[in-house]
């Protein structure tokens, strides 16, 4: 079981902003999962990987694949209180789900 969080590298988020957006995505996708995968993921140590995307369109393409695969996922839009304009798409989380299923969506992306 794992979760992959894909964050945009093209919008110049500072380290703190990046950390916050990754956390938002992780929690939102966790909440999208059913009780069985949530329990399994928590019991297995909540494995996560943070990956890099280069555009908003790339995040939406990945989200579409996750949707078609029936995987829990969440797209995060920033509230715009600090560094980014309101509504800026910043991150996508896929999973928790079996590693192989998450990799079908995010397996070709580089580490952040």
From Swiss-Prot:
Q: Name one GO cellular component term.
A: cytosol
**What broad class describes the main subcellular location of this protein?**
cytoplasm
Record key words, sorted: Cytoplasm, Hydrolase
Q: What Pfam families does UniProt report for this protein, alphabetically?
A: PTH2
> What's its catalytic activity?
an N-acyl-L-alpha-aminoacyl-tRNA + H2O = an N-acyl-L-amino acid + a tRNA + H(+)
Hydrolase among keywords: yes
* Principal EC category: hydrolase
Indicate whether Hydrolase appears among the record's keywords. Answer: yes
InterPro entries hit by this protein: Pep_tRNA_hydro_II_dom_sf, Pept_tRNA_hydro_arch, PTH2
The compartments listed are:
Cytoplasm
Q: Which residues form a coiled coil?
A: none
**What are the GO MF terms of this UniProt record?**
peptidyl-tRNA hydrolase activity
| E.C. code | 3.1.1.29
Q: Which family does it belong to?
A: Belongs to the PTH2 family.
| HAMAP family reported for this sequence | Pept_tRNA_hydro_arch
What's its job?
The natural substrate for this enzyme may be peptidyl-tRNAs which drop off the ribosome during protein synthesis.
Q: What is this protein called?
A: Peptidyl-tRNA hydrolase
Q: Which species is this record about?
A: Haloarcula marismortui (strain ATCC 43049 / DSM 3752 / JCM 8966 / VKM B-1809) (Halobacterium marismortui)
Taxonomically, what lineage is the organism? Archaea, Methanobacteriati, Methanobacteriota, Stenosarchaea group, Halobacteria
Q: Which gene encodes it?
A: pth
């Amino acid at each position: 079981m794992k979760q992959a969080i894909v964050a945009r590298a093209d919008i110049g988020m500072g380290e703190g902003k990046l950390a916050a957006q990754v956390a938002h995505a992780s929690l939102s996708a966790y909440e999208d999962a059913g009780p069985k995968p949530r329990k399994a993921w928590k019991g297995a140590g909540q494995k996560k990987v943070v990956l890099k995307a280069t555009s908003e369109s790339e995040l939406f393409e990945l989200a579409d694949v996750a949707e078609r695969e029936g995987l829990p996922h969440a797209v995060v839009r920033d509230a715009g209180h600090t560094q980014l304009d309101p509504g800026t798409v910043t991150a996508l989380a896929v999973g928790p789900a079996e590693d192989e299923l998450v990799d079908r969506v995010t397996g070709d992306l580089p580490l952040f």
